[in-house]
Amino acid sequence: MGKPCHFAQFDLQPTFLVDLDELGRRYRELVRSVHPDRFADAPEREQRLALERAAQLNDAYQTLKSAPRRALYLLTLNGRELPLEATVQDPEFLLQQMQLREELEELQDSADLAGVATFKRQLKAAQAELEGEFAACWDDARRREEAERLVRRMQFLDKLAQEVRQLEERLDD
């Protein structure tokens, strides 16, 4: 038996634009129903199944609440898998990557918290813009190749955002 569709687990349609509050509400509701405390006196098989179901729900929730992971999952559902470390054949984006990394490195070297906050805001705006572009591409089956390119960009910005959070933590110490 294959893994259940992440969207179906939460009774949602497979689409990029997801109401994250509703997703969170459904997740909490479903995860309560398989909480280990509810199965403390149940046979071992039922306990194991509840634990597996909780793990499936958690995996689905983590995927759907993250825009880059949700976008990649949608591509996968449609039979279009990106290599884990897909090379970007986009010189403009490669240049942008180098510029962003250089800017982050300068912020790290200067320990500029205000600069990091500004960089983080700019990064969030860029992520929101890409998410909007992906949503538009996703709704048009003729633009799936463009959607793949945008997923790669989303993944890069998501990784960069993680690095910014780590830098903030180091500078706060």
Swiss-Prot record:
It comes from the Bacteria. GO terms for molecular function: ATPase activator activity; protein-folding chaperone binding. The keyword Chaperone applies. Residues 5-77 form the J domain. The keyword Acetylation does not apply. Keywords: Chaperone. SUPFAM superfamilies: Chaperone J-domain, HSC20 (HSCB), C-terminal oligomerisation domain. InterPro entries: DnaJ_domain, HscB, HscB_C_sf, HscB_oligo_C, J_dom_sf. PANTHER family: IRON-SULFUR CLUSTER CO-CHAPERONE PROTEIN HSCB. Co-chaperone involved in the maturation of iron-sulfur cluster-containing proteins. Seems to help targeting proteins to be folded toward HscA. Belongs to the HscB family. Interacts with HscA and stimulates its ATPase activity. This is Co-chaperone protein HscB homolog. It comes from Pseudomonas paraeruginosa (strain DSM 24068 / PA7). The gene is hscB.
